[in-house]
Amino acid sequence: MEIGFIGLGNMGLPMAKNLLSAGHRLIVFNRMKEKAAGFQDASVQIAESPGEVASMAKIVLTMLADDNALRSVVYERGLSQAPSFLETLPQGGVHVSMSTVSVSLAKELAAVHALRGQAFVSAPVFGRPDAAATKNLGVVVAGEGTLIETLRPVFEALGHTTFVVGQEPYLANLFKIGGNFLIMGAIEALSEAFALVKKNGGDPEAFLKVVNAALFHSPLYENYGGMVLHERFEPSGFRLELGLKDVKLALEASEGARVPLPLGGLVKDRFLMALAFGLGQKDWSALGLLPLIEAGIKKP
């Protein structure tokens, strides 16, 4: 299958390599061209713009940092005023957005693509860069059913499970935002519990073992608990500053649906505090330092 791929960052690059390993032909674009230049393979073409990718491939995957980056790729013509991605994707072409973006943007893109006879599928992923490299992502997909079946080999080249959650693309983004909201809450709760145990003379590592064995046997608690305990915040799998973006996505969706998220407001403030301490470029699990600082266990 010939696939366009836009966005070769910490997640996008290993994902693109896995598509290549699965035998797909790629047309790639990245704003920082040196990332794309790393592909030395006859099955890869390097495009000069998102519009060029869309003109050469009927299926295009985007893996970008946020709403602004995705809007820029879809709508903007760039300095050369070459046709945009939206203008050059052919009728019947498919845009698969794998980014964590807002529910409102997913709805908008579904509408604008439909007006041009194009299809839009949302397929954000659960997993960090190491999971992307080992094809161990969970792919959450929403879109038209027969189209998803056509795309299934693409998703299977990227992850261990494809979760189809509905026909409306925004539903996949809603599930991803909700899942990330749970991760944020877990990091905060774990870290507060670690501070409680440590300040009272207990061993947080032993506590985590008990929690994983007796209460919440979960990769989430095991992985993030270990990262917080051992302060494995670099290299960053997901920057803390992007965590603030994700909690804002949850709050935006909740406001639009009139759903109170009191924990969301708290977590947003925790991210702001972490940014004030200069932790923005560290992994978002560095949020777990705050309870230790506040308890006087660590210095700011």
Residue ranges of model-derived segments:
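Rossmann-like NAD(P)(H) cofactor-binding subdomain of soluble oxidoreductases
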Residues: 50-55, 59, 64-68, 72-137
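Rossmann-fold dinucleotide-binding core
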Residues: 100-184
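Hydrophobic beta-strand scaffold residues
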Residues: 26, 46, 120-121, 162, ...
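NAD(P)+-binding Rossmann beta1-loop-alpha1 motif at the extreme N-terminus of oxidoreductases
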Residues: 1-63, 93, 129, 161
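Hydrophobic residues within alpha-helices
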Residues: 15-16, 35, 109, 154, ...
